[in-house]
Regions:
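Bacterial N-terminal signal peptides
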Residues: 26-36
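An acidic-aromatic loop/edge-strand motif
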Residues: 468-485, 499, 565, 576-622
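Aromatic- and Gly/Pro-enriched helix-to-coil junctions and flexible linker segments
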Residues: 37-321, 381, 401-462, 612-757, ...
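Short, surface-exposed tryptophan/glycine-enriched loops
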Residues: 300-304, 365, 570-596, 782-784
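An acidic, gly/pro-interrupted, aromatic-rich
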Residues: 103-107, 193, 197-202, 303-305, ...
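Sequence/structural segment immediately N-terminal to covalent heme-attachment motifs in c-type
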Residues: 47-61, 128-132, 360-376, 394, ...
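Short beta-strands within extracellular/lumenal beta-sheet-rich domains
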Residues: 520-533, 572-574, 727-730
Length: 1014
C-alpha cells in the first residue's frame, strides 16, 4: 500500500544530472514524505475516512479539535496540526512512524501523557492508527479542519519591541557636565569623557566615588588586564618613581609599552576564544583532535597584536575566503566555522547537519550581535521580536557550509613555485640558526662534561651514531606501505629485497617540526635499515619523531612502542632488552608506523647513550632548573637566555610554511540547497522555504538580502555563494546598531569586571538593561570614529580616573549601591585560571615566552589521565620541558580531558559561548595551590632561583622572594615573620634550609596579594 523505502535514512552527497543535485532531489522527497502521505492520495483518503476519522472524532476532537483553546496546544483535525504538534512536539515521526508521539500517547507508554486520559483506546483502534502512521498519516481533504494553526504561528513586532534601546541607531551623545561637588574626581586639564558620564550618574544618586589606588595596585591592574602577567619588582619600582611625579604620563607610557608587547595578543585572544567556544578536539566519545585548528588561535592572537580593525576581524572570520584578494590570514580566520563539537557517529545524520548549523547561528548571533537567535529555532522567540522564520533566514547564510569532515576542509595554501622557493629560503635560515645554536652550546656542553655533576660515570664515552635521522645525514631505509611477509624485521630476512629504498624522514610536507626527505602519504609504513658494529655498547639511545602509532624493533626484538603522535623528536634511553638484542656484526633496525589522519611523519636515530646526553636540550630536560642555574652561574644568565631564544627562533622558522594546511570553511557550491523552516526544530518536518535575510526587527524579514551578492570563485576549491560575505558586511557595518555596542561592552567588562550591559551575550528583553546607556553609545560611536581600533579604546578606558579607583569599601555607598552598579569603586577580582598558572611560571623564571605554533601537553596527574575516553590516546605529554612551560593559551584544549588546574579555577566551558567566567570558591582550589605537583614544582624552582641569584643571606632571599610575589617593597615585619617561619621549620620539623625555603616559596605563592587584583 505504501513505499517503505521512502522511510529509510537519506544520505547527502554532491553531484547529479539534469542540472539538479541529489541533495535537492532528496529534500523534495522529504517534503513529499512529511507534507503528503506516501500512499496514493485515493487510498489514503479512503483509509482515513473509513478507519481513522471515526476514532479521532469520537475520542480526540473534543480536546484537540475545537475552536476554544486546545489542550496541550495540539490539534489533530488537520495534517498540518498533527505535524506542527503541541507542547510535547510533533505528533508524527516521519523517519520512524511507529515511534510517533501520537502512538506513544494512545498506547499509554509514558505516564506523563496518556491519551485519551479517561480510557485507553482498544488494541484494534491503536492498530488502525499505527497503520495510518506508517502510511504517512494521510487525511481526507474534505474532512480536514485547518483550525487556527496559521494564527498560532503568527508573528508581529510591536512598537515597544521595535523601539527597544539596542535596536536604535548608535548616536554619539553629548558629554554631560560634572557637578561641582565631584569636580575633584575628574582631570580638568585633560578631562576623560568616561569620568563625566559616570560622575553625572553618581551625582544624581548622591554617591561619592572612591579615590585612586596606589601605584603598585594600578600597575598590577594594567599588567594583568593587558598582558595577563605580573610586573617585575624592577618594573614596579620604575613605574612608582615616574608615577609620583607625572602620573598621567607614567600610565600612558606603560599602556603603550604593554599594548606593543606580543603578550597582549595572547591575553585578549583568550577572551575571544571563550566566546567562540574554542577547542582543539571534536568532543563526544572519540574526541579526536581538530587538525591544524591551532592556526585559528594564532590568527586571533596576531589580529589583536596587529590591532586589526574590529570590523575587518569580524568579516574575516565569517567570510575571509570570500573577500577580494584573500590572504592566508583571512582564510585561516574561517576556522571560526570549524570550532563546534562534531559527532562522527550521530544517530540521526540529517538532524545532526542542522544541529551543527544551529550551533553556528547561536555563536555568530551571540558573539557579534548579542542576540539570542537560538531561542527561535523551534518556535518564535518568547521574549524578543525574532520569528522562527527570522531564525531560518539567518541560518540560510550558512546553509552551503559543508560538514566538518568533508574532504577539502583541510587544504594547503600555496602555489607550488611559491612553496619551493620558500622551502629553499627556509633551509638556509635553519642551517644558519643551527650554526648559531651549536656555537652557543659548545662551551656549555664541554663544561658539563668536565664537571660531570649530572652523570653517574664521569668517563663519558663519546657518542656513536649507528643510524642517523633527517636532521643529520639520514640513513637509507627499505620500505613498503602494505603488510610485508613474516620475518621482515629479522636479520638475514630476504622479504625486503624488492622494497623501495629512500633516505629517512618519511612524511608529508607541513607536519610541524618535521624534516621530510621522502614523501609518505599512505596510512601505514614498514621500514628497515642495516648497520654494523664491532662491539656491544654499554647503553643505547633512540631518538624518534613519530606521528602516529609506532613500533620499533632491533633484530626482531621490540625495543620501543608508543601510541599517538609526538610534536618533535623524543629522546628515549633504551633498556636491557635492547642491549641484549644488539649483536656484533650486522644489525637491523625496523619500524612499523600507522597514521589515521592529518599530517604524518616518521624518523629515527640510534646512538650510543652516555649517562650525560650529548645534547644540551636533553641535559636541561634531565637536570631542570638546578642545572640551568649551574650554567647561569658559570656563563652568565644572558648566554643561557640567548641560547633558549635561539632554540625558540629555530622552532619558529621550522613552522613557517606558506604551504600550511588550513582548517577552513568549505561550501557545497555556489548555489546552496533550499532551506525550509523546520517545524518544532525537526529537520524531518520542513515548512515554508526561506531566503537569506537579516532579522525583521533590524530591517530584514520579508526583504531578503539584496541580490547584489554573487558567487565567489576561488583558486582552490569550488565557488562559494557569497552569502556569508553579505552577512559579514552587514554585521560589520557602522550602521548596525548592535556590533559596536556589543564589542565595547565586552572591553568594558574585561577592565571593570562587569559590562555596562551585565548580560554581555544578550542585549534583548531577557537580558539586563544597560546601567549607563549614554556612556555605552559614546564608546561605541568613538570606536567607529577611531577606525574600529580596540587598542585606542583600551587607552581611553585606562586613562580614566574611574579605572584608577581603589577597591576599598565605603559603608554608605555599600548601603546605596551594594552591587557597585554605578562604578563608584574598583571591583577586586581573583586572577583567572590562565593568569594564575602563567604567573607561577613567570615567578619561578620557568615561563617559556615562545609565540604560536601547535598545542602542547603539560603533565597531568595519573588520576586525571585515567578519565580519558580513550586511555593512552588522550594526552601524550610533551617531552621538552620548555614546551610544557609555555603560556596556558597554548595548552591543548581537549573537550573530554581538561588541564586540571585550569578547570579548577573556572576555565571556560568549550561547548557553548562563554561571555563571563563566574569565579567560584571551592576547596579543590586551595588544595591545588598547596598540593598540586605544578605549584610545588614551581615553589622548588623559585626557592632555588632565590639561592642561585647570589643572595646568601636568608633575610635577603626572603626579602627578594616577597618583592617578586607582591611587586612591592616588603615591610620589615613581613620579612621577620617569614624568617621565623623558615627557622622554625628547620628547628621543629628537621627540614634543611633548602627544604624550608621551598615551604616559604609555597606559602608566598598562596598569598592573596599574589592571587587577587585590588
Amino acid at each position: 500500500m505504501y513505499d517503505q523505502t521512502l522511510l529509510a535514512p537519506l544520505s547527502f552527497s554532491e553531484g547529479g544530472s539534469d542540472g539538479m543535485t541529489r541533495p535537492f532531489l532528496l529534500s523534495l522527497l522529504l517534503v513529499t514524505l512529511v507534507l503528503a502521505p506516501s500512499a496514493s492520495a485515493d487510498d489514503g483518503a479512503v483509509y482515513f475516512k473509513e478507519k481513522v476519522f471515526p476514532i479521532l472524532e469520537e475520542r480526540c476532537f473534543s480536546c484537540h479539535g475545537g475552536k476554544e483553546k486546545l489542550k496541550g496546544n495540539f490539534r489533530v483535525t488537520s495534517r498540518e496540526g498533527l505535524v506542527v504538534g503541541g507542547d510535547y512536539g510533533s505528533g508524527i515521526d516521519a523517519e520512524s512512524p511507529e515511534k510517533s508521539l501520537l502512538l506513544e500517547m494512545v498506547s499509554y507508554k509514558n505516564e506523563d501523557y496518556q491519551m485519551p486520559p479517561k480510557e485507553k483506546l482498544s488494541d484494534d483502534d491503536i492498530d488502525v492508527l499505527t497503520e495510518w502512521m506508517k502510511m504517512g498519516a494521510p487525511y481526507d481533504p474534505e474532512l480536514e479542519i485547518k483550525g487556527d494553526e496559521s494564527e498560532r504561528r503568527g508573528f508581529s513586532i510591536t512598537d515597544d519591541q521595535r523601539n527597544w534601546w539596542a535596536y536604535q541607531p548608535v548616536v554619539k551623545p553629548s558629554v554631560p557636565k560634572v557637578d561641582s561637588e565631584l569636580a575633584a574626581f575628574i582631570d580638568e586639564t585633560k578631562p576623560n569623557p568616561i569620568d563625566a558620564f559616570l560622575l553625572h550618574d553618581l551625582s544624581e544618586a548622591g554617591l561619592t566615588p572612591n579615590g585612586p589606588t596606589d601605584a603598585k595596585g594600578l600597575l598590577r591592574r594594567v599588567y594583568y588586564d593587558l598582558i595577563g602577567l605580573p610586573p617585575t619588582p624592577e618594573e614596579a619600582s620604575k613605574f612608582a618613581t615616574h608615577f609620583a611625579s607625572e602620573p598621567d604620563h607614567a600610565l600612558d607610557a606603560v599602556v603603550d609599552e604593554l599594548l606593543a608587547r606580543p603578550q597582549y595578543g595572547e591575553k585578549w585572544a583568550r577572551h575571544w576564544l571563550d566566546l567562540v567556544r574554542y577547542a582543539e578536539s571534536n568532543g563526544f566519545e572519540r574526541d579526536n583532535s581538530k587538525p591544524q585548528i591551532w592556526r585559528y588561535r594564532d590568527y586571533v592572537i596576531s589580529a589583536f597584536n596587529e590591532d586589526k580593525p574590529y570590523n575587518q576581524f569580524v568579516i574575516e572570520q565569517l567570510a575571509g575566503d570570500e573577500i577580494a584578494n584573500p590572504t592566508m590570514a583571512s582564510v585561516t580566520a574561517t576556522g571560526f566555522h570549524r570550532l563546534m563539537q562534531w559527532d562522527d557517529e550521530p544517530a540521526d545524520r540529517k538532524q545532526h547537519v542542522y544541529d551543527v548549523l544551529a550551533d553556528n547561528v547561536l555563536v555568530t548571533s551571540e558573539t557579534f550581535l548579542g542576540m539570542t537567535l537560538g531561542c527561535a529555532r523551534c518556535h518564535d522567540h518568547k521574549a524578543d521580536p525574532i520569528s522562527q522564520k527570522d531564525y531560518y533566514s539567518f541560518m540560510s547564510f550558512f546553509h552551503g557550509v559543508t560538514p566538518y569532515e568533508t574532504p577539502g576542509t583541510i587544504r594547503p595554501w600555496a602555489e607550488p613555485a611559491e612553496l619551493a622557493a620558500f622551502e629553499d629560503r627556509r633551509k638556509d635560515r635553519v642551517a644558519a640558526k643551527r650554526k648559531e645554536i651549536e656555537a652557543l652550546e659548545g662551551d656549555m656542553i664541554d663544561y658539563l662534561k668536565e664537571v660531570g655533576k649530572f652523570r653517574k660515570d664521569k668517563a663519558a664515552p663519546s657518542v656513536r651514531t649507528y643510524v642517523d635521522d633527517a636532521r643529520g645525514t639520514p640513513a637509507t631505509w627499505s620500505f613498503v606501505t602494505s603488510a610485508p611477509a613474516p620475518g621482515w624485521k629479522e636479520v638475514g630476512s630476504k622479504a625486503f629485497k624488492n622494497w623501495t629504498k629512500a633516505q629517512g624522514g618519511f612524511g608529508t610536507e607541513g607536519t610541524p617540526n618535521s624534516f621530510v626527505t621522502t614523501e609518505w602519504k599512505e596510512p601505514k609504513i614498514w621500514m628497515r635499515t642495516n648497520f654494523g658494529s664491532k662491539e656491544i655498547p654499554e647503553s643505547l639511545v633512540l631518538e624518534i619523531f613519530h606521528d602516529e602509532d609506532v613500533e620499533v624493533y632491533l633484530n626482531g626484538v621490540e625495543i620501543f612502542k608508543a601510541s599517538g603522535h609526538n610534536a618533535d623528536y623524543q629522546f628515549v634511553e633504551l633498556g636491557q632488552s635492547a642491549l641484549d638484542a644488539f649483536q656484533t656484526g650486522n644489525n637491523v633496525l625496523a619500524i612499523h608506523c600507522k597514521q589515521t589522519k592529518g599530517g604524518q611523519f616518521i624518523d629515527a636515530a640510534l646512538r650510543t647513550g652516555p649517562q650525560m646526553p650529548g645534547t644540551l636540550p636533553v641535559a636541561l630536560n634531565r637536570g631542570g632548573k638546578r642545572l640551568e642555574g649551574e650554567l647561569s652561574k658559570h656563563f652568565g644568565r644572558e648566554i643561557v637566555k640567548e641560547w633558549r631564544e635561539a632554540k625558540n627562533k629555530l622552532n619558529s622558522i621550522q613552522r613557517e610554511m606558506p604551504g600550511t594546511p588550513l582548517n577552513v570553511v568549505k561550501e557545497s557550491g555556489s548555489q546552496p540547497l533550499p532551506l525550509q523552516v523546520h517545524l518544532r526544530g525537526s529537520a524531518h518536518a520542513p515548512g515554508d522555504e526561506v531566503e537569506p535575510a537579516f532579522p525583521s526587527v533590524l530591517g530584514g524579514g520579508d526583504s531578503p538580502v539584496p541580490a547584489s551578492y554573487e558567487p565567489v570563485k576561488h583558486e582552490v576549491g569550488p565557488a562559494t555563494s557569497g552569502r556569508r560575505l553579505a552577512l559579514a558586511k552587514w554585521i560589520a557595518s557602522p550602521e548596525n546598531p548592535l556590533t559596536s555596542r556589543v564589542i565595547m561592552n565586552r572591553l568594558w567588562q574585561h577592565h571593570f569586571g562587569r559590562g555596562i550591559v551585565p548580560s554581555t551575550n544578550d542585549f534583548g528583553q531577557l537580558g539586563e538593561d544597560p546601567t549607563h546607556p549614554e556612556l555605552l553609545d559614546f564608546l561605541s560611536a568613538t570606536l567607529v570614529e577611531k577606525g574600529w581600533s580596540l587598542k585606542e579604546m583600551h587607552r581611553l578606558i585606562i586613562s580614566s580616573r574611574a579605572y584608577r579607583r581603589s577597591s576599598t569599601p565605603d559603608s554608605q555607598n555599600l548601603l546605596e549601591d551594594p552591587q557597585n552598579t554605578l562604578f563608584w569603586r574598583y571591583d577586586m577580582r581573583r586572577l583567572t585560571a590562565e593568569e594564575i598558572r602563567d604567573s607561577l611560571l613567570a615567578l619561578s623564571g620557568n615561563l617559556n615566552p615562545e609565540q604560536g605554533g601547535p598545542w602542547v601537553y603539560p603533565e597531568l596527574p595519573p588520576e586525571v589521565l585515567a578519565t580519558a575516553s580513550r586511555p593512552g590516546k588522550g594526552w601524550p605529554i610533551s617531552q621538552d620541558m620548555m614546551d610544557r612551560n609555555r603560556r596556558s593559551i597554548y595548552i591543548h584544549v581537549k573537550r573530554s580531558l581538561r588541564f586540571q588546574m585550569l578547570a579548577d579555577f573556572d576555565q571556560a566551558d568549550t561547548d557553548t559561548p562563554c561571555a563571563v567566567r563566574f569565579a567560584t570558591t571551592v576547596p579543590t582550589q586551595a588544595l591545588a595551590m598547596l598540593n598540586s605537583k605544578l605549584v610545588n614544582d614551581q615553589a622548588v624552582v623559585f626557592a632555588e632561583m632565590l639561592r642561585a641569584d647570589g643572595e646568601d643571606d636568608l633575610r635577603s632571599r626572603i626579602h627578594r622572594g616577597l618583592a617578586l610575589v607582591t611587586q612591592r617593597k616588603p615591610e620589615e615585619a613581613e620579612v621577620e615573620h617569614c624568617v621565623e617561619l623558615v627557622e622554625r621549620l628547620q628547628s621543629e620539623r628537621g627540614l634543611t634550609e633548602e627544604q624550608a625555603m621551598e615551604r616559604f616559596a609555597l606559602v608566598a605563592m598562596n598569598l592573596n596579594e599574589f592571587m587577587y587584583l585590588d
